[in-house]
Curated annotation (Swiss-Prot):
InterPro entries assigned: NifH/chlL_CS (IPR030655), NifH/frxC (IPR000392), P-loop_NTPase (IPR027417), Protochlorophyllide_ATP-bd (IPR005971)
Gene for this chain: bchL
Name of the molecule in the record: Light-independent protochlorophyllide reductase iron-sulfur ATP-binding protein
Protein species of origin: Chloroflexus aggregans (strain MD-66 / DSM 9485)
Pathway membership, UniProt: Porphyrin-containing compound metabolism; bacteriochlorophyll biosynthesis (light-independent)
BP GO terms, sorted: light-independent bacteriochlorophyll biosynthetic process; photosynthesis, dark reaction
Keyword DNA repair: no
GO molecular function: 4 iron, 4 sulfur cluster binding; ATP binding; metal ion binding; oxidoreductase activity, acting on iron-sulfur proteins as donors; oxidoreductase activity, acting on the CH-CH group of donors, iron-sulfur protein as acceptor
PROSITE patterns noted in UniProt: NIFH_FRXC_1, NIFH_FRXC_2, NIFH_FRXC_3
Organism placement in taxonomy: Bacteria, Bacillati, Chloroflexota, Chloroflexia, Chloroflexales
Residues annotated to bind ATP: G12, I13, G14, K15, S16, T17, K41, N182, R183
Residues that hold Mg(2+) according to the record: S16
Family: Belongs to the NifH/BchL/ChlL family.
Keyword Hydrolase included in the entry's annotation: no
Amino acid sequence: MSLILAIYGKGGIGKSTTSANLSAAMALKGAKVLQIGCDPKHDSTFPLTGHLQPTVIDVLDSVNFHLEDVSKEDVIRTGFAGVDTLESGGPPAGSGCGGYVVGETVKLLKEFGLYDKYDVIVFDVLGDVVCGGFSAPLNYADYGLIIACNDFDSIFAANRLCLAIAQKSQRHKVKLAGIIANRVDYEYGGGTSLLDQFAEKVGTKVIGRVPYHDLIRRSRLAGKTLFEMEGPGKEECTRPFEEMAEYLLAQPQATIPNPYHDRAIFEAIGGWR
């Protein structure tokens, strides 16, 4: 049975770049990995493949939504380090329900029997959990991961995600494996001071600290993982992913989080330094 990870975080926090590099790091350590992009923008797997691939919704539309006419080869592409990739896609902007498409993609994986064919399956899910469709990966995941940075909005979203994981854990096996700190800047951004306090309060920990570095920006523009890039800072940028891969492929010290109520988190963050 696969190790299933569901990665969430505030919109624009860097989930896709982080997910792709984490998938690559686990693959480089010998794991057979499938990364699934769960966002209508369908750009989650771009750093692994170097292009935007056909989505589940594109393929279904081409066969008039006859599921029996779709094979896994129609929707899966192989990227860097042998990572298999899949994008759920979604309706055009301003129409339809992206969450519904994510829910249908989860069902499709079951139809193809993919849950037993990989060592690791990574769900990269957009933004906050705002509906049942986008929370569907938590029904199958062993662990949730939250990506955040050291600011108010990011931590507020992380708290709501902790609430979603805590609620799902009442009926499913999912637990929180930890928080990934992204864009860590010790000179101007306070490092991870707020995130560390938040993690301790809700009963988890920061499992990785990804630096704020131009190499990461350039890797995204190039459609490459950090492991394929050259230049100053490469080791500094790749090391956190290697360490997180080791942590997740072993037995993570996962917990059921104890989040704040919305009003309480406002008051709490204001008192942290």
